[in-house]
Structure formats: C-alpha cells, structure tokens
Amino acid sequence: MELWLDEALELKNGRALKIKVKEFLHSRTTPFQKIDVFESVGFGRMFTLDGVVMMTEADEFAYHEMIVHVPMMSHPNPEKVLVIGGGDGGTVREVLKHPSVKEVHLCEIDKGVIDVCYEYFPEIANAMKDPRVKHAYEDGAKYVKDYQNYFDCIMVDSSDPVGPAEVLFKRPFYETMANCLKEGGICTTQGESFYYHGSIIRELFNFIPEIFKHCGYYYTVVPTYPSGIIGFTYCSKGPDPYTVVPDPQRVPQGLKYYSAEMHKAAFVLPQFAQKHIVRK
C-alpha cells in the first residue's frame, strides 16, 4: 500500500502538497502542537507540525541559509544573535558559521520540537549543543521584552501566523524587537509566500516602515513550502541589506544556496509582488 502525506495548509483554498512517504517514524502531541516525522521518497527525512511541512532534509538549506546569511552578511560584526523558533537547529547551525558570533540565544516555545529533532535530525540539530547557545523554552514575544539594546541580529524562524506563532506577526512584537536590537542591528522574519499570502505581507508593511530605519522583503525557493517560495521581511536599525554589497571573503565555506550574488538577486521581486511591499 502506498502512503502519501497530504499537507492541509492550503486545502481550504483548493491547494495541497502531496509527498510520497516511505516510512512513518514518529508522532507526539505536545501542549502546543502535533509533531510527526516521516521518511519520504523524494525529500529524505521530514517533519510536520499539525500536518504542515516544516523541514525536509533535501531542501532545508535553502531556507536556513537565506534567513541567516542575508542579515549576518549585512551586519559588519554580528556577535550576539537571537533565534526565535527554529527548534530544528538549522538556523542556529548557519549562525554559528560566522566566526564573529560569541553568543546565540535560542527561544523555542516547544521543547518537544528540539527533542524530536535531536533524535531524528542529529546532523542539523546538534548545532544547538554548541556551548555558545543558550536555550529558552518560552514565548518569543515575551522573551524579547527582557533584553534592551542587546542583540546584533535576530532571526524569527517561526511557523505560519496561527496558534502560538500568531503574535509574532503583530506590531507590538516588531516594536519590542526594535528595542531589543542594538543600534545598527538587523532582524529577519519568516514572511510567507507572495503568491499565496499577499494580504499577510501587506498587513506587515502597514506598520514595519514606521518602526525601522530600513525594511523590505526578499525570498528563497523551497520546493516543499506552499507555492515553492518562502519570503522574509527584513528590518534594520543600521545597514540596509538591500544595498549592502556582501564581502565574498566573509561568506562561509560550503554553502549550497547563499552567495554574494544570490544576496543581491533575492531582493528582485516580480511586479505583482512589489505592490505588497514597502521598501525603505
């Protein structure tokens, strides 16, 4: 009997992602969500939260490299970094590729995600065991309130704006992040797909330009995410990632997606998507 995963995230809009499953490996329900792990035929090992694909071994690098290296390469000397969400460890792994980093705070509300990823995705998750990484299992929107003028870079590696992640797409959270960043600090947040989620993106850019010196949107290509595209909002109190010319000598070795050229290209949006964005 063939097994297939049908991702239901876009089902109400008449769209679905179907992935052939080789083996069902694990399932658990935490106080926050249901976590499932599969061995897929075409994308390697993968996990879902409440039936929505979060990561696969085959394409995770495209997301993790772009959420991290665009802000990190735009900042002249990122030493203190905050990752909100990101319990799979991929974002932390990429952050630690920058030798300037002295301290990484990982704020993941659901410890169950980290535990599952340690067991089933050790090559990705073990980066979270680095001694520079400080773990906090709490709401990221509350965590940032405890730090003022502290972080050089913040990456909000969140799920979609439902349930526990909904607050991470609201104005008060962005205002608190601005206070949390040092002068010259930069943050990036998971910004949905400009094909499917234009209304969410427009809502974000109704208030982000009022809070930050620079802001805008860029994207990456991930086959197992809705529409195959996932975007990021960037917000900066200092350098503008859109105009920064990355130093090729600072680009970490061994990357699969990010490069100095890709950094520049990621900001080029199709005309229909530009109407959702305010670049400042």
From Swiss-Prot:
Q: State the PROSITE patterns in the record.
A: PABS_1 (PS01330), PABS_2 (PS51006)
The entry's spermidine-binding residues are H64, D88, D157, S158, S159, D160
Q: Which domain of life is it from?
A: Bacteria
SUPFAM superfamilies reported for this sequence: S-adenosyl-L-methionine-dependent methyltransferases
Residue numbers annotated as active site? D157 (proton acceptor)
User: Start and end of every PABS domain?
Assistant: 2-237
One biological-process term from Gene Ontology?
spermidine biosynthetic process
Localization terms from the record: Cytoplasm
As one GO molecular function, the record gives: spermidine synthase activity
EC assignment: 2.5.1.16
Q: What does this protein do?
A: Catalyzes the irreversible transfer of a propylamine group from the amino donor S-adenosylmethioninamine (decarboxy-AdoMet) to putrescine (1,4-diaminobutane) to yield spermidine.
Query: How does this polypeptide assemble, per the annotation?
Result: Homodimer or homotetramer.
Protein known as? Polyamine aminopropyltransferase 2
Q: Which gene encodes it?
A: speE2
